[in-house]
Design a protein with these regions (language model features):
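Short, acidic/polar
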Residues: 87-103, 210-215
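Carbohydrate-binding surface patches
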Residues: 282-324
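Active-site-proximal helices and loops of the catalytic beta/alpha 8
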Residues: 17, 23-24, 97-100, 113-190, ...
Length: 365
């Protein structure tokens, strides 16, 4: 009995969302608006909602990798910007009702898969329609592999967060900052040390201190950060979006929950750490040391972040004019680890392997 099973499923989702809310958590849902599976019910009931080629066959979506189009063979492309306006209205109403349905069950946000492939016109309709019902609903755009101009476009369409590519940056090459500089200040971004498309961080690097360092760097760099369950415990088994289930829980290789709490507390205390704004790389002329200065969007706050990227060797850094850099004579050390009681204008400091320092100043103080 399909209706009975649907009722059970809805009750389960609603109960899950309620239990999460009671623990201070909000449930987000992954939605795919660009395409459907090849056996979707929509294909049976509304085949004219799909894009067709010249031979009348439904098109399959895909992506460019190294200049080659990789077709997603088990998926079918929706025609979200149909030239037939009646059809377009049908599709858009479907998506509005679809999201509303799950909001009524308790879902508080949506991670929009391949958001950059969906016509911006649809997002400009859909997001305001949903936020009229509940302004607190969060929309995150999956924007990996898309151009900076598209990120700005999606942000203007109403997305609360876009995803950045800091995960793949070695903190040296220019490509990331070149892309980031084109849209920073126009969108809030979400960083991540691992996700369902990558190897587990612990599998790649294996060390607790490295995990803490990268989490800190990404957290301080981006307005927000996301982790997959198990990152905090050093899980090593790659996530599979189809087959991973609770039986894949691992013993873990380390526990960095306290360190994550400390970094999150610092992040929630200072406004500048909750936005994407102007960043200037501070060159220490040392490949082991990564540093940057950030100025808040309102110009009132500044930070200097310095990290030792080496896992085995400590390194000394020198900053001769910190007060001038941060435009204040009252600079605080707000690092998640060891903190200096008093921060001088001239700093000589020995960074331990994987140590991250963050100095904060407020204009005029």
């Amino acid at each position: 009995n399909l209706e009975a099973e649907q009722e059970k499923g809805n009750a389960l989702i609603s109960e899950f969302c309620s239990n999460a809310n009671a623990k201070g958590l909000k449930v987000m849902m992954d939605i795919v608006v660009n395409h459907t599976s090849f056996d979707s019910e929509l294909l049976m009931t509304n085949s004219y909602w799909y894009e067709h080629d010249n031979d009348g066959e439904i098109k399959k979506p895909g992506t460019l990798e190294d200049g080659h189009f990789i077709e997603w063979g088990d998926l079918l492309q929706l025609d979200n910007l149909s030239k037939d306006l009646d059809t377009r209205r049908e599709i858009w109403k479907y998506w509005r009702d679809y999201l509303t349905y799950y909001i009524e069950l308790g879902v508080k946000g949506f991670r929009c898969d391949a958001a950059y492939m969906v016509p911006t016109e649809l997002w400009k309709f859909l997001i305001p329609e949903i936020k009229k019902q509940n302004p607190e609903i969060i929309f995150i755009a999956e924007t990996l592999n898309c151009k900076p101009e598209k990120i700005k476009e999606l942000s203007a369409a109403g997305f609360d967060f876009v995803m950045n590519s800091i995960k793949w940056w070695n903190y040296k090459d220019h490509w990331f900052m070149m892309d980031y500089s084109k849209w920073m200040g126009t969108a809030n971004s979400l960083a991540f040390p691992e996700n369902h498309d990558t190897e587990r961080f612990a599998k790649e690097y294996g060390t607790k201190d490295k995990a803490i360092a990268i989490y800190a760097i990404q957290s301080y760099f981006s307005s927000s950060i996301a982790i997959t369950t198990g990152f905090e415990y050093g899980f090593t088994k790659k996530i599979d979006v189809v087959t991973t289930n609770p039986l894949d829980w691992e013993e873990g290789t380390y526990d960095i929950t306290n360190e994550i709490k400390g970094i999150n507390k610092t992040k929630s205390t200072y406004k500048i750490l909750q936005e994407d704004s102007k960043v200037y790389i501070y060159d220490f002329h040392n490949n082991k040391v990564f540093g940057y200065i950030r100025e808040s969007n309102d110009g009132e706050e500044n930070i200097l972040v310095i990290a030792n990227l080496c896992e085995t060797e400590g390194v000394e850094f020198y900053v001769p004019n910190l007060y001038n850099l941060l435009r204040s004579e009252r600079v605080l050390d707000i690092s998640h680890g060891h903190r200096m009681e008093r921060v001088a204008d001239e700093i000589n400091y020995y960074l331990q392997p994987n140590e991250v320092k963050i100095f904060y100043a407020k204009k005029g103080e």
